[in-house]
C-alpha cells in the first residue's frame, strides 16, 4: 500500500468550544471590499448607494459655472484583470481591473445628450486571499480603529466641568463647554466662541422665554391670596417668562430673574395673580443657561442669526440671507457636513429618535435642529446631576469603530473625484460647447494619483507579513489606531492603550506589540465580526427565562451594556437550564452574581476572548499575560521548516488557522483523486464527472524571503506487484498477483481519510497502477463566511502538516542547568537536530538587473565582459545569464552586463585606429549583477523579460532578468528559538549527540533548557505541554486542549499513567560524557519549539574596507551599509579614564578619519616602519567649517608658532576676513 499520510488519532479535551461557529477568519477584508465594489450585483443600475457607487453619485452631476451644460453619471463597469496574481508578482505589475463609467453630457440650450463610456483608470482589486498586489508586492490594507462620528459627552476632572462634542464624518466640529465665568460656550472648529443659547436662538427659538421653556419644566405659583408660607417658598425661584406691566408695557422682571421680597410686593401691587417659575432638575438652582442668555444679548431670531454671522465672518455684511446661508453651510448642507450613516445612527440611539427608515436619506446625514437642542438639554441635565444621564466613556468600543479596506479606498477616491470636478468645471468654461465630450472634459490623473498614493505609501497599506501562514492571517485581522485621522503614537495616553471591559470578545487583550505601539495596534478576537456600521460584534447564546437557547446573537458593545452575561463554563443540564441558583455574570466592568431569570445571554466559547494567535497557545490559562503576549507575537515570526510537524499538544485551532490563511489548496467540489504528482492534484468531480486540475505552487519567494512550497496532502493507493483485481467492496480492494498471492488495500483508514476504488473486478492492473483514489469533500460557506462543510485539504502549504498549522517541531527536552551553557535563557541543542535537518529551513533571495537605454547607448546583457578570467564565466550561458542549479558565492556573476562608457575627446588618428581595430575594452564598463556579500546558495529559477518578446517593462528598460537563489539554513549557534509560551532563548552550543544527557533507555535528549526560566516568568503552560507531549509521543496520539477549556492537571496525569510515564514527568538522566547518574531526577518531555526569523547569519557582519561618510570621513553604520565600528564619546571617556593618550590619539586620527594619516599607515605597515605621525582628523575640519559659518576663523599653530594649513582651499572670504588668533583657551 502506498499512501502519503501518517494518520494520528486526536483527543480533544474541550467541553464547550465549538469551532464550527467560527466565521471565516479573513471575512473582514473580503466583506469590506465586496461592499465597496458590489461586483456581485448583476445589473449595474441596481447597485446600492455605497462604496464606489456612492463616490460617483456624490461627485455627479457636475454643472458648468455658467449653467449651460451638465454632466451626469449613469453607472460604472469593471473590466477583467490583464494578468493573474502570480503573473503580476513575477512581472512587478499590479493586479487591477480597468474601471469605466457611463457618463452623459447634456447641453441645456439644445437638449442634446452626448453619452460615452469613459475610462477612469485601473483599480487594484483584492485577491481571493484578502490581499492586493501592487507593483509585484503583496500588500494588506489594515483596518483602522477610529473615534466614531456622533455626539459625545465628557467630564473633565481637573476643571470639574462637562462638555459635549458633535463629531461629523466630514465637516466642522461643534463643541459645547463651560468657560471660567460659568457660561455654556459653543465652539466651531475649536476657534470661534459664542454663548450656546445664541446658536439655539439662531435656529428659530428667538426669545429668552422660548429657550427656557425648551430646556426646563415650569410650574405656576399663586401670588394673589397666597399665605406668607407659600410666598416665602417663592423667594429664590426664577421666572420662566418676562413679567410685563400691562398698563405701561414695561418689563418688570426678565425671564430667568430671581424673585426676591421686593419683587413680590411689586407683583402684588400690579395685582399679578400667579407667576410661571422654572422647575430645575432635582430642584437645584442651576443658572448655566440663564448666564448664557444674559451674555448673548439678543432676544429675537433675526438678531441672533446676524450676530452669529458677524462672529463667524467678521468684516462681511450681515444680511439675514447671508447669515442663514452661513448657518446652513456649516451644519445643514450635505455638501459640506456629513455625519455619515454611523453618526446618524449614534445620535438616534443616544437620544432615542427611532426613525430607521430615514437613515438612507442624504438630508438625514446632516445635523437637525432637534439634535443640537437635545445636546444642550443632555448637557444641562448632566450639570444638574439628573438621574440616568452619564458622560460617555471615550475608550468604550461603542464609541470606536472600524474603517475597513472598502471605506478607506472610498475616502481616498472622494479626494480624487473632488479634484476631477475642479478640472471639469475649468474645462467647461474654456472650451466651446460644440466640441465638448465627456472624454475630453474628464482628467483621470487625480484619480490614479490618489489610488497609487494610497496603495503605495499610506500608513495603512502595508507590505504583507508573509513569514508564515499565521503571520499572514494575523496581518489581515489587525486593527490599527494610528494612521490618517487616527491617534499619534506620541500623544496617545495610557487610557487609550489599556484593556477595556468592552473589548471582551471583540479585541484580544493579549496580542499587541511590545514597545511604542503597545495597545495601539490590536488584533480582532477569534469570533468577532464587523457590522454594517463598522462596530465590532461578538456572538452570544440567547437565554430565555433561565433557559439557554441554541440561537446565537451578535451584539455590539453598546447593546451589551444593558445585559447580564453568563460565562460559557456555567453548568447547564440537558434541558439547557442552569444548575446553580446564583451564577457568576459579567455586567459592564463588574462581575455580580445573578439568578438565572435575570440573565439574558451566555458566552459562546471561552475562546471568544482571544485572537487566533493567542488561541494557538495550549494551557494559556497557566501563563502570565505578559509572556502569553510574547508567545503570540513570536509564533508569527516562526520560519517555515523543511519538514513540517504538527504539535503533539495543540488547541484545536490549528486546522482552522491553516485553512483560512489560504496557503493550503482546498477542494471546491466533491470528488475522487484521479492523479497526484509534485506539481498538482487531479480530481474527478462527482457531479460533472470532469477531471479538474489543481496546480501547486513550488518554491516561490515570500515577502520576507522564506520559501512558499506546496506538497500534496491526498493520495492514491497503488499495487506493488500488479495482477488481476479479484474483489472490490466499500471496505477494501483485493488484487491477486501472478503468483496467486493476495494483495489487500484497506479503503476506510479513518473518518477523515477514505478511498474509493477506481478499478473493477476482473480488471488486469500493472505494477504500480492505481487501484483507489481518496474521497474528496468540497467546501461550503454560510452567509457570514462561516464554514458549513470544510473542503478536503489537497495540498499543504508552508508550515502546514496534513492541513494543520505546523510552525515548529516537537523535540525531547530536559529542564536542567548544564555547565552554564543554558545560563540566562540560552539553549543547548544536540547535534542530531542539525544532522537530521530538524530545524533547517529554505530561504530564497531575489536579485534583479535591468538593461536600460542610456545617453551613450544601450546597456547589454552579455557574456562578453572585458578583463575577467574564464573562471568567472564557468556557470554563465551563451547570453551571460547564470544556469539554474549553479552554486553561487559572494562576488560571483549572476548576470553579465556591460554599460557604454563616456569617451573623452580623442585625436583623429586614435579614432581611425579605433574604428579599424574596434577595441571593445575601451568603450564599455562591467556593470554585471554580482552575488552580494554575505549571500550564497543555489540558483533555482531565472525569469527574463524583454521588450522584443512583447513584455511590458518600465520606461527606459529594454530587458530585465530576475535570478532566484535558495539557501538551506541549518540551526546555528546564535539563532533565536522560542516555545509558544514566551519562553525564548538563543542557541548557545551545539553538542555531540553522545555527550548529551540520556534517559534510562539510552535515548539522548534533543534540547536542554534552564529550569530557572520558568518560575519567575510564570509561564507554567510549557510544563503542562511538555508533560502531555511525552504522553502523546508514547501513545501515538495528538492532543487538543482549547484555551480556558482544556485538560486539567488530573487529565494530564491520567494520560501519563496510560503511557506508563511517572505522574511528575521526572526521569533519571545520565551524563553523556561520563555515563554517571545525575544526582536529582530531571523533568523531561516533548515541547514544541519554533525557529524564529532572527537568524544569526542575517545579523553577523564583518567589515574590511568599506564606504565612508562624505562629510566626516568615518565609516557608515550598520550591516546594510557595510558599515564599521564607531569609537563613540563613551569609549573615548573610558580611555581617558586610564590616561591612554597614545592609544586615544591613534584611535581618533590614523585609525579613524585622518585621511592622509590612514593612507600613510598603510604604506608604513607595508614597509615595516613602526612610527607614524598623526595628522588632523576630518571631523575637526568639519568643526572648523561650522565655526566659519558663524563668521569666526580659526588658525592652528604648531609648537614653533607656524600656521598649520587645515583647509585644501582658500576662498575670497578667508583672505579678507578678520582673523581671530588664539593659542590658549583663555584667549577664547
UniProtKB/Swiss-Prot annotation:
It is an enzyme of class 2 (transferase). GO terms for biological process: DNA-templated transcription. Its EC number is 2.7.7.6. Pfam families: RNA_pol_Rpb2_1, RNA_pol_Rpb2_2, RNA_pol_Rpb2_3, RNA_pol_Rpb2_45, RNA_pol_Rpb2_6, RNA_pol_Rpb2_7. One of its GO terms (cellular component) is DNA-directed RNA polymerase complex. SUPFAM superfamilies: beta and beta-prime subunits of DNA dependent RNA-polymerase. Keywords: DNA-directed RNA polymerase, Nucleotidyltransferase, Transcription, Transferase. It comes from the Bacteria. One of its GO terms (molecular function) is DNA-directed RNA polymerase activity. PROSITE patterns: RNA_POL_BETA. It catalyses: RNA(n) + a ribonucleoside 5'-triphosphate = RNA(n+1) + diphosphate. DNA-dependent RNA polymerase catalyzes the transcription of DNA into RNA using the four ribonucleoside triphosphates as substrates. The RNAP catalytic core consists of 2 alpha, 1 beta, 1 beta' and 1 omega subunit. When a sigma factor is associated with the core the holoenzyme is formed, which can initiate transcription. Belongs to the RNA polymerase beta chain family. NCBIfam families: rpoB. This is DNA-directed RNA polymerase subunit beta. It comes from Leptospira biflexa serovar Patoc (strain Patoc 1 / Ames).
Amino acid at each position: 500500500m502506498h499512501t502519503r499520510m501518517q494518520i494520528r488519532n486526536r483527543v480533544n479535551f474541550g467541553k464547550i468550544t465549538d469551532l464550527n461557529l467560527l466565521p471565516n477568519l479573513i471575512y473582514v477584508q473580503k466583506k469590506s471590499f465586496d461592499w465597496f465594489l458590489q461586483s456581485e450585483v448583476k445589473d449595474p443600475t441596481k447597485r446600492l448607494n455605497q462604496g464606489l457607487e456612492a463616490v460617483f453619485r456624490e461627485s455627479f452631476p457636475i454643472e458648468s459655472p455658467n449653467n449651460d451644460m451638465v454632466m451626469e453619471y449613469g453607472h460604472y463597469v469593471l473590466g477583467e484583470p490583464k494578468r493573474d496574481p502570480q503573473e503580476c508578482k513575477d512581472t512587478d505589475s499590479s493586479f487591477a481591473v480597468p474601471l469605466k463609467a457611463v457618463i452623459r453630457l447634456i447641453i441645456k440650450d439644445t437638449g442634446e445628450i452626448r453619452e460615452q463610456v469613459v475610462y477612469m483608470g485601473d483599480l487594484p482589486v483584492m485577491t481571493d486571499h484578502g490581499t492586493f498586489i501592487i507593483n509585484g508586492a503583496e500588500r494588506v490594507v489594515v483596518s483602522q480603529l477610529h473615534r466614531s462620528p456622533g455626539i459625545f459627552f465628557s467630564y473633565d476632572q481637573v476643571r470639574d466641568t462637562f462638555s459635549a462634542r458633535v463629531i461629523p464624518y466630514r465637516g466642522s466640529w461643534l463643541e459645547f463647554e463651560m468657560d471660567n465665568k460659568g457660561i455654556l460656550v459653543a465652539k466651531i472648529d475649536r476657534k470661534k466662541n459664542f454663548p450656546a443659547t445664541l446658536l439655539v436662538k439662531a435656529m428659530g427659538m428667538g426669545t429668552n422665554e422660548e429657550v427656557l421653556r425648551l430646556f426646563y419644566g415650569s410650574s405656576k405659583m399663586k401670588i394673589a391670596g397666597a399665605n406668607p408660607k407659600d410666598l416665602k417658598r417663592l423667594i429664590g425661584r426664577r421666572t420662566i417668562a418676562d413679567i410685563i406691566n400691562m398698563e405701561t408695557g414695561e418689563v418688570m422682571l426678565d425671564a430667568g430673574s430671581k424673585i426676591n421680597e421686593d419683587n413680590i410686593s411689586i407683583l402684588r401691587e400690579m395685582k399679578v395673580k400667579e407667576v410661571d417659575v422654572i422647575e430645575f432638575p432635582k430642584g437645584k438652582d442651576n443658572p448655566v443657561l440663564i448666564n448664557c442668555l444674559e451674555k448673548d444679548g439678543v432676544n429675537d431670531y433675526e438678531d441672533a442669526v446676524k450676530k452669529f454671522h458677524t462672529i463667524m465672518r467678521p468684516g462681511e455684511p450681515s444680511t439675514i440671507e447671508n447669515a442663514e446661508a452661513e448657518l446652513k453651510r456649516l451644519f445643514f448642507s450635505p455638501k459640506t457636513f456629513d455625519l455619515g450613516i454611523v453618526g446618524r445612527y449614534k445620535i438616534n440611539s443616544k437620544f432615542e429618535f427611532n426613525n430607521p427608515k430615514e437613515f438612507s436619506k442624504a438630508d438625514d446625514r446632516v445635523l437637525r435642529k432637534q439634535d443640537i437642542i437635545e445636546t444642550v438639554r443632555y448637557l444641562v441635565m448632566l450639570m444638574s446631576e439628573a438621574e440616568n444621564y452619564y458622560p460617555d466613556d471615550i475608550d468604550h468600543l461603542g464609541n470606536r469603530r472600524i474603517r475597513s479596506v472598502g471605506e478607506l479606498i472610498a475616502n481616498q477616491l472622494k479626494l480624487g473625484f473632488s479634484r476631477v470636478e475642479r478640472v471639469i468645471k475649468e474645462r467647461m468654461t474654456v472650451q466651446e460647447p460644440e466640441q465638448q465630450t465627456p472624454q475630453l472634459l474628464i482628467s483621470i490623473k487625480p484619480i490614479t494619483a490618489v489610488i497609487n498614493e494610497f496603495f503605495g505609501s499610506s500608513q495603512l497599506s502595508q507590505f504583507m507579513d508573509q513569514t508564515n501562514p499565521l503571520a499572514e492571517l494575523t496581518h489581515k485581522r489587525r486593527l490599527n489606531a494610528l494612521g490618517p485621522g487616527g491617534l499619534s503614537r506620541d500623544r496617545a495616553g495610557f487610557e487609550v492603550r489599556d484593556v477595556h471591559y468592552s473589548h471582551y470578545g471583540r479585541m484580544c487583550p493579549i496580542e499587541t506589540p511590545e514597545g511604542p505601539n503597545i495597545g495601539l495596534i490590536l488584533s480582532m478576537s477569534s469570533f468577532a465580526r464587523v457590522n454594517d456600521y463598522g462596530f465590532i460584534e461578538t456572538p452570544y447564546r440567547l437565554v430565555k427565562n433561565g433557559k439557554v437557547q441554541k440561537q446565537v446573537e451578535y451584539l455590539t458593545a453598546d447593546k451589551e451594556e444593558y445585559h447580564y452575561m453568563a460565562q460559557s463554563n456555567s453548568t447547564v443540564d440537558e434541558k439547557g437550564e442552569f444548575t446553580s441558583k446564583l451564577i457568576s455574570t459579567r455586567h459592564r466592568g463588574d462581575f455580580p452574581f445573578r439568578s438565572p431569570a435575570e440573565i439574558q445571554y451566555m458566552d459562546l466559547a471561552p475562546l471568544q476572548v482571544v485572537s487566533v494567535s493567542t488561541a494557538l497557545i495550549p494551557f494559556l490559562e497557566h501563563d502570565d499575560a505578559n509572556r502569553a503576549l510574547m508567545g503570540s507575537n513570536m509564533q508569527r515570526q516562526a520560519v517555515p521548516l523543511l519538514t513540517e510537524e504538527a504539535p503533539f499538544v495543540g488547541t484545536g485551532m490549528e486546522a482552522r488557522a491553516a485553512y483560512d490563511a489560504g496557503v493550503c489548496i482546498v477542494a471546491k467540489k466533491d470528488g475522487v483523486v484521479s492523479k497526484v504528482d509534485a506539481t498538482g492534484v487531479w480530481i474527478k468531480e462527482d457531479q460533472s464527472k470532469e477531471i479538474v486540475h489543481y496546480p501547486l505552487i513550488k518554491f516561490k519567494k515570500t515577502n520576507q524571503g522564506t520559501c512558499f512550497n506546496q506538497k500534496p496532502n491526498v493520495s492514491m493507493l497503488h499495487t506493488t506487484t500488479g495482477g488481476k483485481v479479484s474483489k472490490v467492496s466499500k471496505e477494501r480492494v483485493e488484487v491477486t498477483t501472478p503468483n496467486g498471492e493476495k494483495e489487500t488495500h484497506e479503503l476506510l483508514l479513518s473518518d477523515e481519510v477514505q478511498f474509493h476504488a477506481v478499478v473493477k473486478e476482473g480488471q488486469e492492473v500493472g505494477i504500480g497502477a492505481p487501484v483507489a483514489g481518496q474521497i474528496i469533500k468540497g467546501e461550503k460557506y454560510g452567509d457570514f463566511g462561516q464554514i458549513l462543510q470544510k473542503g478536503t485539504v489537497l495540498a499543504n502549504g508552508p508550515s502546514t502538516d496534513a492541513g494543520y498549522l505546523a510552525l515548529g517541531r516537537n523535540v525531547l527536552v530536559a529542564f536542567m542547568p548544564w555547565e552554564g551553557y543554558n545560563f540566562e535563557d540560552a539553549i543547548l541543542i544536540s547535534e542530531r537536530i542539525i544532522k537530521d535537518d530538524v530545524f533547517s529551513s529554505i530561504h530564497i533571495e531575489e536579485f534583479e538587473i535591468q538593461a536600460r537605454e542610456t545617453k551613450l547607448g544601450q546597456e547589454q546583457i552579455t557574456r562578453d565582459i572585458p578583463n575577467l578570467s574564464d573562471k568567472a564565466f564557468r556557470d554563465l550561458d551563451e547570453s551571460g545569464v547564470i544556469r539554474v542549479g549553479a552554486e553561487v558565492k559572494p562576488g560571483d556573476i549572476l548576470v553579465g552586463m556591460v554599460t557604454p562608457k563616456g569617451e573623452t575627446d580623442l585625436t583623429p588618428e586614435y579614432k581611425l585606429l579605433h574604428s579599424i581595430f574596434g577595441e571593445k575594452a575601451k568603450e564599455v564598463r562591467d556593470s554585471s549583477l554580482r552575488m552580494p556579500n554575505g549571500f550564497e546558495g543555489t540558483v533555482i529559477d531565472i525569469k527574463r523579460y524583454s521588450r522584443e518578446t512583447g513584455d511590458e517593462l518600465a520606461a527606459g528598460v529594454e530587458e530585465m532578468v530576475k535570478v532566484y537563489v535558495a539557501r538551506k539554513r541549518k540551526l546555528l549557534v546564535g539563532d533565536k528559538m522560542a516555545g509558544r509560551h514566551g519562553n525564548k532563548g538563543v542557541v548557545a552550543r551545539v553538542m555531540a549527540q553522545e555527550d548529551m544527557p540520556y534517559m534510562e533507555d539510552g535515548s539522548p535528549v534533543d534540547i536542554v533548557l534552564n529550569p530557572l526560566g520558568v518560575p519567575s516568568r510564570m509561564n507554567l503552560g510549557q510544563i503542562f505541554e511538555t508533560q502531555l507531549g511525552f504522553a502523546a509521543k508514547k501513545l501515538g496520539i495528538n492532543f487538543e486542549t482549547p484555551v480556558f477549556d482544556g485538560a486539567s492537571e488530573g487529565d494530564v496525569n491520567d494520560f501519563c499513567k496510560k503511557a506508563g510515564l511517572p505522574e511528575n514527568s521526572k526521569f533519571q538522566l545520565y551524563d553523556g560524557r561520563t555515563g554517571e547518574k545525575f544526582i536529582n531526577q530531571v523533568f523531561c518531555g516533548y515541547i514544541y519549539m519554533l525557529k524564529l526569523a532572527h537568524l544569526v547569519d542575517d545579523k553577523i557582519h564583518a567589515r574590511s574596507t568599506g564606504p565612508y561618510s562624505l562629510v566626516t570621513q568615518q565609516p557608515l553604520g550598520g550591516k546594510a551599509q557595510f558599515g564599521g565600528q564607531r569609537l563613540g564619546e563613551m569609549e573615548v571617556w573610558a580611555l581617558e579614564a586610564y590616561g591612554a593618550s597614545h592609544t586615544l590619539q591613534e584611535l581618533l586620527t590614523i585609525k579613524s578619519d585622518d585621511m592622509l594619516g590612514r593612507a600613510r599607515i598603510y604604506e608604513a605597515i607595508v614597509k615595516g616602519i613602526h612610527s607614524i605621525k598623526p595628522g588632523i582628523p576630518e571631523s575637526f575640519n568639519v568643526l572648523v567649517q561650522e565655526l566659519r559659518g558663524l563668521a569666526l576663523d580659526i588658525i592652528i599653530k604648531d609648537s614653533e608658532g607656524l600656521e598649520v594649513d587645515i583647509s585644501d582651499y582658500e576662498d575670497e572670504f578667508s583672505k579678507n576676513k578678520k582673523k581671530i588668533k588664539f593659542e590658549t583657551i583663555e584667549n577664547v
